[in-house]
Amino acid sequence: MKVEVKKIDDANVAVQGNIENKVVEANVDKLAREAGKQMKVDGFRKGKVPPHVVKKLHGDKLQQDAEGDALRSLIDLGVKEAGINTADILGEPIFKKYDKKDEGIEVEVEISLRPTIEAEGYEKAVPAFEKPEATEKEVEEKLEEIAAQQAPFEKIKRKRMVRDGDTVVIDFEGFVDGVAFEGGKAEKFSLKIGSGQFIPGFEEQIIGMKYDEEKTITVAFPEEYQSKELAGKEAEFKVKLHEIQEQVPAELNDALAQKLLQDEKATLDTLKEKLKEQIVNEKTSKIYNEELKPKIIEALVAHFDFALPNNIVEQEIDAKINAKAREMSEEELNDFKENPEKVEALREELREEAENSVKATFIVDALAKKEDVNVDDQEVSQAIYYEAMMSGQDPQQVIEYYQKNNLLPAVKMGMIEDKLFGKLLGL
């Protein structure tokens, strides 16, 4: 078997060759002999099935496997002749030609390699950055906000009527056509008037009630109400007002700081310093995500010049097309399926964006190695766990979802990217 190897650029090599029929036939014979040693066919002892019988029973499969073996041999030969280190090969080859002729199969494939990146001079691509500060006013506002959140509800001493915005404690029971319905009853229920927690019209009719007053409220369930039995129906609620509550602002003192920081030695000044640090971090995070990160990626992509592996670029284009397809209507999708030229036009439209994305990924990988930036699997799991907790999801289920859908490498790469850029920016 002869091959011709042609270097396209530093990241891509073309391998051309012809797989002769006799090579495929020899592979078919070999596979048939091996299969016959494992098969059980009526009329033959197990493991003694002749090759010609195996071919008759599984000819198409043998032919397919034989061609596959020959193709792999051709590619391996091309890799050897090109002096390629197999560790540098990325993904699967791109097939440019696979033509079956009378004398054999004409093959042309492109093999993609890991780019070589000289990680030098990139420091000048890092944008200038002045770390933000937290003003005394911002710290005081944050402190007051936290104090308000910590403020407990207390029964007001003066017995007045309910106003909009009050928090009340009530008993209620609902009836439709004179019959109490499931889930329509509660005692000593705390409700903030104007919150919209109840169906329209309920909270408004609480306004003006007095302590220990009992009242019947008439409302109508919305047509789209979740319970079909109640949707659109009129209901009566018997309501009793027990008390009106108001929040008593927490005192800004050392005791509040100790409670919030879970530290008996903490003072109000300690809390203020923590809040100042938090405000600075929030401002920095906002600037980083909205301004610095896009700038540094753009600058690094412009700074480095190297060949990209074609198969990885094509995969990125595929991913972007799939993302767009998920946003298309059924009519738009059918239009693309029926017009291959539109798909090709879209691929070319997305090519530059895909190339920049792939380029940025290889740059980050190279610079992370140079700067000794690492993220281990435990850090990835902790980040996903924290994100799940903050969004009210089951952390274990979220982690399993990421594992099942092979999303952990992307999360890890994103964390490495942020850690690297943070180091370069001095954050």
UniProtKB/Swiss-Prot annotation:
* Major localisation: cytoplasm
Which keywords does this Swiss-Prot/TrEMBL entry list? Cell cycle, Cell division, Chaperone, Cytoplasm, Isomerase, Rotamase
- Which EC number(s) are documented for this chain? 5.2.1.8
Q: Record's InterPro entries?
A: PPIase_dom_sf (IPR046357), PPIase_FKBP_dom (IPR001179), Trig_fac (IPR005215), Trigger_fac_C (IPR008880), Trigger_fac_C_sf (IPR037041), Trigger_fac_ribosome-bd_bac (IPR008881), Trigger_fac_ribosome-bd_sf (IPR036611), Trigger_fact/SurA_dom_sf (IPR027304)
Which superkingdom does the taxonomy of this entry point to?
Bacteria
Which molecular function term from Gene Ontology is one that the record holds? peptidyl-prolyl cis-trans isomerase activity
Q: What is this protein called?
A: Trigger factor
The reaction(s) this protein catalyses: [protein]-peptidylproline (omega=180) = [protein]-peptidylproline (omega=0)
Subcellular location(s): the record lists: Cytoplasm
Could you tell me which Gene3D superfamilies the record lists for this protein? 3.10.50.40, Trigger factor ribosome-binding domain, Trigger factor, C-terminal domain
Gene encoding it?
Answer: tig
